[in-house]
Amino acid sequence: MYKQFNANITVLIFIFVISGCSWNSRIGNKDFYYRESILLKANNHAGLITLYRDKLKQKEDDAVRLKLANAYYLTGDTKSSLYYLQPIAHKDDESIYILQAKNLINKDDNIGAAAVINKLLAISPNNAEAYNLIGIVFANNGEISNSETAFEKSRALFIPDEIAMNNLAVAAMFDDRYSDAIRILLPDYLAGKRNPLMLHNLVFSLIQLGDKQYAKKIIIAEKMAKDPDELILALSQVDNLSQQKLPTRENNE
């Protein structure tokens, strides 16, 4: 009798522990947003992925699913981002289309990206990000004139100037117009803007035009490398820039 009673207590305790763990794993909305705000401030994408996955285990939510897909995108995991987007990919939503297009561009699927961007423009004809992304598609396809037109349209629709100007500069670089790239980037640098991608493109363009002295001055001032001469040598040996791809993450996040 005692053994049976003891066994029953053990089972009850075991069940209680399991139930307690399950209860603790449920995230209330207040706690969810609190944790999310901390993780966002820390740029802790891995933590955000865990948080969003746990929330979706409790209940399906399109907004949380989109956040999960975006967190995967920000870690560079295009495959997972597209996978978790799939259940909501059919919905006419600007944010969904934008994230789809970014992922497809990163996969070098410019045809697929263009198709998604066209859907985006159909529901949002004046979407600045749509024109920025189609500009990237054009640039990656070697259609430099079309890419510049798209970037200018994006800028006219008030995408951040830093994004527009950098992409216009890269389009010029793809076309071996390094003096144009410097003309676009240098004013922002002199105005105190220090975006890492912009700095890299400015230094690269200066080196391509033979102004290694000014390039070295910027590298030292901005602490871009421990050995400025080594970086200059490496950048001076880069060729076939037109074979490179214009990224999406640095321009939009």
For the regions a language model picked out, list residue spans one by one:
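N-terminal leader/linker segments that initiate helical-solenoid repeat arrays
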Residues: 20-83, 250-253
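Helix-start (N-cap) detector for alpha-helical repeat units in TPR-like alpha-solenoids
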Residues: 28-29, 62-63, 93-96, 128-129, ...
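Structural signature of tandem alpha-helical TPR/SEL1-like repeats
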Residues: 42-50, 75-84, 107-116, 141-153, ...
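Terminal, low-structured helical/coil segments at or just beyond the last alpha-helical repeat
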Residues: 192-253
